């Protein structure tokens, strides 16, 4: 079953029925997400074998079931109720068969899937009742049982307490339209049984009280191990034996009543006929290749199809609901398996060596933008490495803000006024902290690299601190810069050296701590958890998704060019490769989504544009999350199916978190609003501010670098200088999905109301929806 078939089945339904089907999909997908697997039939055993079509004159001829024809099969047994890992629970049992030609890759849909369960019939005749049952509590289900809308005999027939999977009979319950070789149609139902089993086993005795529950506790005194059914089946194959089944079918003429899967077809009138023999001989339960097979009753043969449904009230709706639910669930499950974590020792998110999830493939528009600027880094560097050509390329790059500030003076002479303004409003914002009990200065910016390793033979200060004196009437003044144990003041000869050294330390800190750790990798852990734990239809995911676009792709494809073994920072900085990663991990260990910028920033510093802008953006995000999600979707968020997914989201965040501070989050749904505000603030506002100022602040290596390159040979120096110039230009140039164009009407309105506070520091055209560069 593919997307076209899915849409065709869905579009045959009336609008109310489509809504109910979509809700069913969401319910089952949520169950699968909560169980970290399938929503039903979660734990099972997988085996391979073959199927041989039998000769029978009573079976109508068929293009798939041609006597003597042989096929490969992949087969699965499982307990029906998802999450019921104990085989000794009184539960329904299931089997699923995928049939393919000899040699087919059976991990993908092939000729036919059959999904069969214990019980000759299903307990609910229509998709509307199925939807009602799935969304009901115990008392409501009891009422359905009492009223007869939930068929008691069907519930009783499904529950089994067997000693082996092989002693049970399994039924499709659904009927299929069987088209014979003469193009005559009839309906068919299938069942599977052990040819050596004359009667079905595992039946319940009268002492078992049946209610609306689909699984009952194990019987008192039952000491069988929790996975005894799977172990028993596996042991049969381990001993060199085979497991045999016979596939049978009933046939009857085309009539609506036949499609009702809650009614038994009298075997005296519609006898069971042998169709095929199945031999299973190879356990594949430990083979990850087959673990995520998505069996679907909608994966049908062109001469064997489910009857069409036009309403959730017709009998055919149950079969169509199964096809739609299984298809949607497989997408959700497959999506989750594409978002794979590496070791907890890795940086958070998807390791770059894992394949990119299909849903993260960027748009053609973004790829066009990326290609537009890639020539700067990929193709324009002179292959001969000639110094004069490189100098010409570097000089030809656009002028930076620092170039304009320095003007025609000595390029190493950085004006104090410019230096001070960029500490307040440049590419490393929000780093100023109030000092305590110091004489002469009130605030400071500190970069401490003492515990990190420097490359052999090179030198870089362990400690660099810029000290400021803040007077609300007279403004901000530079007090001094401390480098290791030496304090250097503006009146000293070494003052320009001190400023350049500070800029080197800040350049490294901005890239590793703020830009990469706090924005890129920090937010990727939330993207991963959201994509893995929330179904695509979940209100939270639908709301936050525009703020997640592009991050995983850019982290996988472009970030290695910055911090990979041959990337810019490992070559340009004085730190070893290991220490570069350690700096980012250390920063990540301090980060929690239970944070806000208002409490973290200095107040009322003259000339500070960032603090009021950050405060204003945080305040508007409060309204954005409330008015865009929490209020309009209040009832939907409270439903069990959606609440379970949010709980799973927080559980995964807790499990994967690198936070090691003394005030960890609670990791529960009470913090959902804080989480969403935190993600959007970093994805949109903070990354936009820091990223688009990189070229102005650090684009010219004559003014700012990550270290002293005089110890390198000329070719290496040239390569670093060119890389810095071109890389910061590309990072600062690509604009994709600006809020002004792609934001929701609500977000645009809220930003316009704060534009007079935001725009002095960040032009609104530079405010993006997500981290995508």
From Swiss-Prot:
Domain of life where this protein originates: Bacteria
UniProt cross-references to InterPro entries, sorted A to Z: Catalase_sf, LipOase, LipOase_C, LipOase_C_sf
Positions of transmembrane segments: none
Catalytic function, reaction form: (9Z,12Z,15Z)-octadecatrienoate + O2 = (9R,10E,12Z,15Z)-9-hydroperoxyoctadeca-10,12,15-trienoate
The protein's role, per its UniProt record: Catalyzes the conversion of alpha-linoleate to (9R,10E,12Z,15Z)-9-hydroperoxyoctadeca-10,12,15-trienoate in oxylipin biosynthesis. Also converts alpha-linoleate to (9R,10E,12Z)-9-hydroperoxyoctadeca-10,12-dienoate.
Protein name: Linolenate 9R-lipoxygenase
Enzyme class of the recorded protein, top EC level: oxidoreductase
Alphabetically ordered keywords of this record: Fatty acid biosynthesis, Fatty acid metabolism, Iron, Lipid biosynthesis, Lipid metabolism, Metal-binding, Oxidoreductase, Oxylipin biosynthesis, Plasmid
Pathway(s) it belongs to: Lipid metabolism; oxylipin biosynthesis
Molecular function per GO: heme binding; linolenate 9R-lipoxygenase activity; metal ion binding; oxidoreductase activity, acting on single donors with incorporation of molecular oxygen, incorporation of two atoms of oxygen
Similarity remark: Belongs to the lipoxygenase family.
């Amino acid at each position: 079953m593919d997307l076209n078939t899915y849409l065709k089945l869905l579009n045959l339904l009336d609008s109310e029925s489509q809504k109910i089907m979509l809700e069913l999909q969401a319910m089952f997908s949520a169950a699968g997400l909560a169980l970290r697997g399938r929503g039903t039939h979660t734990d099972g055993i997988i085996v391979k074998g073959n199927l041989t079509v039998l000769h029978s004159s009573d079976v109508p001829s068929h293009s798939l079931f041609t006597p003597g024809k042989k096929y490969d099969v992949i087969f699965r047994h499982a307990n029906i109720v998802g999450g019921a890992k104990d085989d000794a629970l009184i539960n329904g049992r299931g089997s699923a068969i995928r049939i393919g030609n000899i040699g087919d890759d059976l991990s993908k849909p092939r000729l036919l899937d059959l999904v069969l369960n214990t019980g000759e019939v299903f307990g609910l005749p229509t998709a509307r009742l199925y939807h009602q049952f799935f969304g009901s509590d115990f008392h409501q289900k009891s009422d359905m049982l009492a009223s007869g809308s939930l068929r008691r005999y069907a519930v009783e027939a499904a529950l089994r307490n067997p000693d082996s999977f092989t002693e049970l009979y399994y039924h499709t319950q659904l009927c299929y339209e069987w088209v014979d070789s003469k193009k005559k149609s009839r309906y068919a139902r299938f069942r599977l049984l052990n040819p050596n089993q004359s009667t079905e086993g595992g039946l319940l005795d009268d002492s078992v009280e049946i209610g609306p529950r689909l699984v009952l506790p194990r019987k008192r005194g039952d000491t069988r191990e929790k996975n005894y059914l799977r172990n028993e089946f596996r042991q049969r194959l381990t001993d060199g034996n085979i497991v045999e089944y016979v596939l049978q079918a009933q046939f009857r003429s085309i009539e609506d009543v036949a499609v009702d899967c809650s009614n038994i077809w009298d075997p005296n009138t519609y006898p069971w006929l042998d169709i095929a023999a199945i031999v299973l001989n190879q356990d594949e339960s430990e083979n990850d290749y087959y673990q995520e097979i998505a069996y679907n009753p909608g994966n049908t043969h062109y001469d064997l199809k489910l009857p069409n449904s036009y309403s959730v009230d017709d009998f055919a709706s149950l079969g169509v609901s199964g096809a739609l639910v299984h298809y949607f669930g497989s997408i959700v499950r497959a999506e989750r398996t594409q978002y794979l974590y590496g070791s907890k020792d890795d940086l958070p998110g998807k390791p770059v060596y894992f394949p990119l999830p299909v849903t993260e493939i960027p748009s053609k528009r973004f790829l066009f933008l990326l290609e537009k600027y890639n020539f700067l880094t990929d193709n324009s560097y002179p292959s001969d490495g000639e110094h004069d050509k490189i100098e010409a390329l570097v000089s030809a790059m656009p002028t930076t803000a620092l170039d304009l500030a320095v003007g025609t003076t000595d390029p190493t002479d950085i004006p104090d006024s410019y230096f001070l303004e960029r500490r307040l409003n440049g590419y490393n914002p929000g780093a100023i902290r109030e000092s305590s009990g110091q004489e002469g200065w009130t605030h400071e910016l500190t970069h401490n690299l003492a515990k990190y390793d420097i490359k052999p033979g090179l030198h870089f200060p362990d400690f660099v601190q810029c000290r400021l004196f803040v007077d609300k009437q007279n403004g901000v003044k530079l007090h001094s810069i401390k480098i290791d144990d030496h304090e250097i003041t503006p009146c000293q000869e070494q003052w320009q050296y001190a400023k350049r050294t500070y800029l080197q330390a800040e350049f490294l800190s901005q890239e590793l701590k703020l830009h990469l750790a706090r924005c890129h990798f920090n937010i990727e852990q939330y993207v991963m958890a959201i994509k893995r734990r929330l179904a695509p239809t979940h209100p939270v995911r639908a709301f936050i998704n525009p703020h997640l676009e592009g991050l995983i792709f850019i982290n996988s494809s472009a970030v290695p060019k910055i911090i990979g073994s041959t990337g810019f920072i490992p070559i340009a900085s004085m730190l070893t490769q290991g220490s570069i990663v350690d700096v980012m991990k250390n920063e990540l260990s301090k980060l929690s989504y239970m944070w806000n910028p208002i409490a973290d920033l200095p107040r009322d510093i003259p000339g500070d544009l960032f603090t009021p802008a950050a405060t204003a953006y945080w305040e508007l995000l409060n309204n954005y999350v409330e008015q865009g999600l929490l209020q309009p979707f209040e009832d939907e968020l409270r439903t069990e199916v959606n609440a379970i997914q949010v709980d799973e989201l927080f559980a995964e965040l807790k499990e994967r978190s690198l936070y090691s501070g003394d005030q960890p989050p609670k990791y529960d749904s009470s913090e959902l609003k804080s989480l969403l505000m935190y993600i959007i603030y970093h994805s949109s506002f903070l990354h936009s501010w820091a990223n688009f100022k990189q070229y102005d602040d650090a684009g010219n290596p004559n003014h700012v670098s990550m270290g002293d390159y005089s110890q390198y040979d000329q070719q290496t120096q040239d390569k670093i200088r060119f890389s810095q110039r071109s890389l910061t230009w590309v990072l600062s140039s690509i604009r994709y999905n600006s809020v002004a164009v792609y934001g929701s009407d609500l977000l645009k309105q809220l930003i316009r109301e704060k534009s007079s506070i935001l725009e002095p520091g960040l032009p609104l055209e530079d405010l993006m929806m997500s981290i995508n560069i």
